[in-house]
Amino acid sequence: MKTLNRRDFPGAQYPERIIQFGEGNFLRAFVDWQIDLLNEHTDLNSGVVVVRPIETSFPPSLSTQDGLYTTIIRGLNEKGEAVSDARLIRSVNREISVYSEYDEFLKLAHNPEMRFVFSNTTEAGISYHAGDKFDDAPAVSYPAKLTRLLFERFSHFNGALDKGWIIIPCELIDYNGDALRELVLRYAQEWALPEAFIQWLDQANSFCSTLVDRIVTGYPRDEVAKLEEELGYHDGFLDTAEHFYLFVIQGPKSLATELRLDKYPLNVLIVDDIKPYKERKVAILNGAHTALVPVAFQAGLDTVGEAMNDAEICAFVEKAIYEEIIPVLDLPRDELESFASAVTGRFRNPYIKHQLLSIALNGMTKFRTRILPQLLAGQKAKGTLPARLTFALAALIAFYRGERNGETYPVQDDAHWLERYQQLWSQHRDRVIGTQELVAIVLAEKDHWEQDLTQVPGLVEQVANDLDAILEKGMREAVRPLC
């Protein structure tokens, strides 16, 4: 069986216009996949040079396959049908290592056609590293490497304003573009680079903050033999991902034209502020996960897919989203409902086995950040507590018993909560404290909740009633009236 290369698999090759820091699965099934579609359907005509930003020889370089690799996108489409689509990606030309090919790395700045910089160097990638110097070959941190590359471009083109770059980080931190820009400016000042360069950074370059959303499941180790048999070739860089994707970019409106999104619309939004989209994702996608997990798991289910195929649990989650979360969010309702519909479709994806226990990690913090704001906003708006979000809190407290049908399961959270719950549930079993007292102790933890939740009218009583129902009847019976 042949291995992918451009000689045996000839096809389009595009001029290099994009630098990409990061060779991982996510960028290849997200950014490079989108660039490939735009190259095919428009005159974007842009090839990607992947820069490996860390010193590692594993995985091997994409250049061993001349930049070629296959994405397999699978999940439920807009009609709810299971689809699996294999695509040979030709947008990547080559990969270089900034550690072993530093001169080649700097030379990227000399190419007048270079226009975009994408990156995903993990959440820790956009950070300051004390001691990074201009003359390091290379510096340690990604922002320092980028500063050096930008200065190379500024110098090579004598500060030409038409030679700036559009810089689009995909790291999962809030306002990643702003954070990256601040660090680049910090290095420029630390290294005493000319004032003209600092002005050029602001005048000629755009740092765009982003929200990225796609579950990328990466190399399909367990299915490789079967998939390669179907494809008819060997691919060491096979990359799998879900059908859904969303790319929100906070940047100039002209970006839509530059990326040719006006000619071939993708699920890419160019916006003035990513904040409402971030809030939407946290509240609907992450919030639904967090509400679902303790309810579904204690109802005897193990994966998100099983939960969504269970009529009662699915109804509970959908009503929580549409009746209690969406009404308190600050975006047009049709946009929110469209996003919610995509989310529930993603939860049903038969190709992804998302274990409920893995999502349950740090459940107390997740509840505070993902559900509590909507619970409190709903109570404020209507004067009554949202029934399902409140029930989800009771289910979460019950989950920390660590026992289902007589069998124990691992609960992962910070030591404070694990010890606290062990003590509280032990006291409850010994009838030292009642359910309402247990709930009041949990809700009074100001350091965690950032307020005293026992002061929210009716919250202790309702959570305690729900918790008693769960303990006395079991999760199935307790949740049924809310389905």
Curated annotation (Swiss-Prot):
It catalyses: D-altronate + NAD(+) = keto-D-tagaturonate + NADH + H(+). GO terms for molecular function: mannitol-1-phosphate 5-dehydrogenase activity; tagaturonate reductase activity. One of its GO terms (cellular component) is cytosol. Pathway: Carbohydrate metabolism; pentose and glucuronate interconversion. Coiled coil: none annotated. NAD(+) binds at residues 18-29. Its EC number is 1.1.1.58. The keyword Lyase does not apply. GO terms for biological process: D-galacturonate catabolic process; mannitol catabolic process. InterPro entries: 6-PGluconate_DH-like_C_sf, 6PGD_dom2, Altronate_OxRdtase, Mannitol_DH_C, Mannitol_DH_N, NAD(P)-bd_dom_sf. Keywords: NAD, Oxidoreductase. Belongs to the mannitol dehydrogenase family. UxaB subfamily. PANTHER family: ALTRONATE OXIDOREDUCTASE-RELATED, MANNITOL-1-PHOSPHATE 5-DEHYDROGENASE. This is Altronate oxidoreductase. It comes from Escherichia coli O139:H28 (strain E24377A / ETEC).
